[in-house]
């Protein structure tokens, strides 16, 4: 059967629901408030509505199997029967799935890390020597049948074998998972046959790992694997999707295989990639010309120029997003606070689908068929270029002056001596990362302020009560360096964005970060200006309640960029320095108010690292420079902390040392302190707090378990440089879990401290 050619599609779509319906349903299931049937009903409704919406918008090929209760890599591990043995102890299949993702009282979860250079996090499959791959196609077949029954032109989407293995982790003495590639090829061939038998005309195999340097042999592997899969006797047409960058030599390798279509990212990859591969002349090129991971409206005329150029290089050209629209909010429609100019510059998920359809129509019927849409696009481009909010000469001049004079602090040893004399901390000092649980009282107060039910003064009174409660709890637990708990912050980036000029905070711009965790990234559209102190009042109030040091809590410039939708009209380095200047001014004000410890979090340092090694040195240069610009305005006696998480740190370990923070806390519990060896390898000599327990799991770790982690850390870090802290902030945990876990953490620190 010859597959029906398609002209307009998207790589994938979000699954949380336009009103975060899936978040509420899964959290209700985890808490035992609802049953499996209700969760499955919500999921089925979301799938149905998503597919219907995409088809009604004009897509003639709709991705299915992009829905997930938690994560698509975890779904693929289930499909390949590759869950670890400890998760298999759970008898119910859905509970087993969630145990692998989140853990439970008996099962430690799988690791979680960043999905390439995005703010989405995936669950890292573990491949052991005993892992025996086998096909479990129930989910993908079920969703295909659902969609076809609905009359949807459905295209199942599955993570490809190369990407699955390169993003997995070998355990228990196993080598690199990619060594198992030959075992997966026949399983994928079996899957293709089943999909064809069940009515699939096309299948999409996602291979974003091909745009990275993760494997030097990737081009040859891609050609070998897809020669075999493309030669299968019974299969749908194969569309191999690459995204997030340039597939390089892998593109030519794929083009030499029998696959029918290849997707290329023409937003984050070069426009010339396709023209350089003559073998694509017989293929469908799925051209990712609409940005799937940022919120700016597409310049339709420029995109159409790219597409027109491609027509001479491929048998067919289909229009698509550059990647899944999972990374952007659902729609601009709920954003009623947007001014007309800013609204005209933006496109969220629904608007991006419309852009794809418009461009496909222009390719089919000519530019004159979409003349009105192109005119509106041109007007938006012109409006954005001329808006005075985009440039602030005073900010730019200040940055140039500080950078020219140098942004380095004093000698680390001298700083440590000065801080020791000021703080008088015990060996193995205990602290937490920053946030404490956002209670229902906090959420109700925030909602009441938004609705006008209470005024700002009453809101601040309630938040101060929450701060006082958190300070009291920490003192009762015996922590050494305290935090104020951040009750006034809905999000560690949005809180600052709402107070800085150059940002717009959305009302409903939710995107999935991991599992049920959703974030609302602000939009950074112009030059960044700090007009007033943002945290000083809250931190000094907390400090007034205790004699112990309370950390000032700030978000670093790179993380603010990584967790925002950032302007694309100037280099990221310039924007990072503008944010860094605002944070620098805040650190100076905190110090002037008597705060002795200031934490500038950079959990996203690894996230923005370019996927190709050739581009990484320049990024790390300006990222480190922005952090130092933000933190070099304070005295030696002020202790600067930073925190990093959610990442594999190996590729940025040298940069972590170059940040020159006095204390660096790191996510380390799930990876069993591996990061400490990496730090030692680059001569890291400042203090470090490797996370001693995993806060992303509801498990309460025992005192003995934490003490064991501390002793493991002491084998790599001397006691005078070791801090004791959880992996990450505690915002998403419930108060009982937090109290029990911290009680055990402090007890473990005292136990180990006694033996130092």
Curated annotation (Swiss-Prot):
L-methionine binds at residues 433-435, 486, 601. It catalyses: 5-methyltetrahydropteroyltri-L-glutamate + L-homocysteine = tetrahydropteroyltri-L-glutamate + L-methionine. The active site is at 696 (proton donor). One of its GO terms (molecular function) is 5-methyltetrahydropteroyltriglutamate-homocysteine S-methyltransferase activity. L-homocysteine binds at residues 433-435, 486, 601. Pathway: Amino-acid biosynthesis; L-methionine biosynthesis via de novo pathway; L-methionine from L-homocysteine (MetE route): step 1/1. The keyword Amino-acid biosynthesis applies. Its EC number is 2.1.1.14. InterPro entries: Cbl-indep_Met_Synth_N, Cobalamin-indep_Met_synthase, Met_Synth_C/arc, UROD/MetE-like_sf. SUPFAM superfamilies: UROD/MetE-like. Binds 1 zinc ion per subunit. Keywords: Amino-acid biosynthesis, Metal-binding, Methionine biosynthesis, Methyltransferase, Repeat, Transferase, Zinc. The keyword Methyltransferase applies. One of its GO terms (biological process) is methionine biosynthetic process. Zn(2+) binds at residues 643, 645, 667, 728. 5-methyltetrahydropteroyltri-L-glutamate binds at residues 20-23, 114, 517-518, 563, 607. It comes from the Bacteria. CDD domains: CIMS_C_terminal_like, CIMS_N_terminal_like. Catalyzes the transfer of a methyl group from 5-methyltetrahydrofolate to homocysteine resulting in methionine formation. Belongs to the vitamin-B12 independent methionine synthase family. HAMAP family: Meth_synth (MF_00172). PANTHER family: 5-METHYLTETRAHYDROPTEROYLTRIGLUTAMATE--HOMOCYSTEINE METHYLTRANSFERASE. This is 5-methyltetrahydropteroyltriglutamate--homocysteine methyltransferase.
């Amino acid at each position: 059967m010859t597959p029906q050619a398609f002209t307009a599609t998207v790589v994938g779509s979000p699954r949380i629901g336009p009103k975060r319906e899936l978040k509420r349903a899964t959290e209700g299931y985890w808490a035992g408030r609802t049953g499996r049937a209700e969760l499955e009903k919500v999921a089925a409704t979301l799938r149905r509505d998503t597919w219907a919406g995409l088809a009604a918008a004009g897509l003639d090929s709709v991705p299915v199997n992009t829905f997930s209760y938690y994560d698509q890599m975890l779904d693929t591990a289930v499909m390949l029967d590759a869950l670890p043995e400890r998760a298999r102890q759970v008898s119910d299949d859905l509970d087993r799935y969630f145990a692998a993702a989140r853990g439970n009282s008996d099962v430690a979860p799988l690791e979680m890390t960043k999905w390439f250079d995005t703010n989405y996090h995936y669950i890292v499959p573990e491949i052991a020597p005993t892992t025996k791959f086998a096909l479990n196609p129930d989910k993908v077949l079920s969703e295909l049948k659902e969609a076809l029954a609905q009359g949807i032109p459905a295209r199942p989407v599955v993570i490809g074998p190369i990407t699955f293995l390169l993003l997995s982790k070998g355990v228990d003495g196993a080598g690199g998972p990619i060594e198992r590639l030959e075992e997966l090829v026949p399983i994928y061939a079996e899957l293709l046959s089943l999909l064809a038998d069940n009515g699939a005309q096309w299948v999409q195999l996602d291979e974003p790992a091909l745009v990275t340097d993760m494997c030097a042999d990737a081009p040859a592997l891609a050609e070998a694997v897809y020669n075999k899969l493309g030669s299968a006797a019974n299969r749908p047409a194969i569309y191999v999707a690459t995204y997030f960058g340039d597939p390089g030599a892998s593109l030519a390798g794929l083009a030499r295989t029998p696959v029918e279509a290849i997707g290329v990212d023409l937003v984050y990859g070069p426009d010339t990639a396709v023209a350089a591969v003559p073998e694509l002349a017989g293929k469908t090129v799925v051209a990712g010309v609409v940005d799937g991971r940022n919120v700016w409206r597409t310049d339709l005329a420029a995109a159409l120029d790219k597409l027109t150029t491609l027509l001479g290089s491929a048998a067919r050209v289909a229009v698509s997003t550059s990647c899944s629209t999972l990374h952007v909010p659902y729609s601009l429609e709920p954003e009623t606070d947007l001014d007309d100019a800013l609204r005209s510059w933006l496109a969220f998920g629904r608007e991006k689908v419309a852009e794809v359809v418009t461009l496909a129509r222009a390719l089919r019927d000519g530019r004159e068929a979409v003349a009105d849409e192109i005119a509106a696009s041109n007007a938006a481009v012109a409006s954005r270029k001329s808006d005075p909010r985009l440039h602030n000469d005073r900010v730019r001049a200040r940055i140039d002056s500080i950078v020219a004079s140098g942004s380095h602090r004093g000698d680390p040893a001298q700083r440590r001596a000065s801080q020791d004399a000021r703080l008088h901390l015990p060996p193995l000092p205990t602290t937490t990362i920053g946030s404490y649980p956002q209670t229902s009282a906090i959420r109700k107060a925030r909602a009441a302020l938004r609705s006008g039910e209470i005024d700002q003064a009453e809101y601040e009174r309630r938040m101060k009560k929450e701060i006082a409660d958190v300070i009291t709890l920490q003192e009762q637990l015996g922590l050494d360096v305290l935090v104020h708990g951040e009750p006034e912050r809905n999000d560690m980036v949005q809180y600052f964005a709402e107070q800085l000029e150059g940002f717009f905070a959305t009302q409903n711009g939710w995107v999935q970060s991991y599992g049920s965790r959703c974030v609302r990234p602000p939009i950074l559209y112009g030059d960044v200006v700090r007009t007033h102190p943002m945290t000083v009042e809250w931190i000094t109030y907390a400090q007034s309640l205790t004699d112990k040091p309370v950390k000032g809590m700030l978000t670093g410039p790179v993380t603010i960029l990584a967790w925002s939708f950032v302007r694309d009209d100037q280099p990221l380095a310039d924007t990072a320095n503008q944010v860094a200047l605002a944070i620098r001014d805040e650190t100076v004000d905190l110090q002037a108010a008597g705060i002795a410890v200031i934490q500038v979090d950079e959990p996203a340092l690894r996230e923005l690292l370019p996927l190709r090694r050739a581009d990484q040195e320049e990024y790390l240069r300006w990222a480190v420079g922005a952090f130092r610009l933000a933190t070099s305005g304070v005295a030696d006696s002020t202790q600067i902390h930073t925190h990093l998480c959610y990442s594999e740190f190996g590729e940025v370990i040298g940069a972590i040392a170059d940040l020159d923070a006095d204390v660096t806390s790191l996510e380390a519990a799930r990876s069993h302190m591996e990061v400490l060896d990496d730090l030692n390898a680059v001569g890291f000599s400042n203090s470090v707090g490797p996370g001693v327990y995993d806060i992303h799991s509801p498990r309460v770790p025992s005192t003995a378990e934490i003490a064991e982690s501390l002793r493991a850390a002491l084998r790599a870090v001397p006691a005078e440089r070791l801090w004791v802290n959880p992996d990450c902030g505690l915002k998403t945990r419930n108060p009982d879990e937090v109290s029990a876990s911290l009680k055990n953490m402090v007890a473990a620190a005292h136990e180990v401290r006694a033996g130092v």
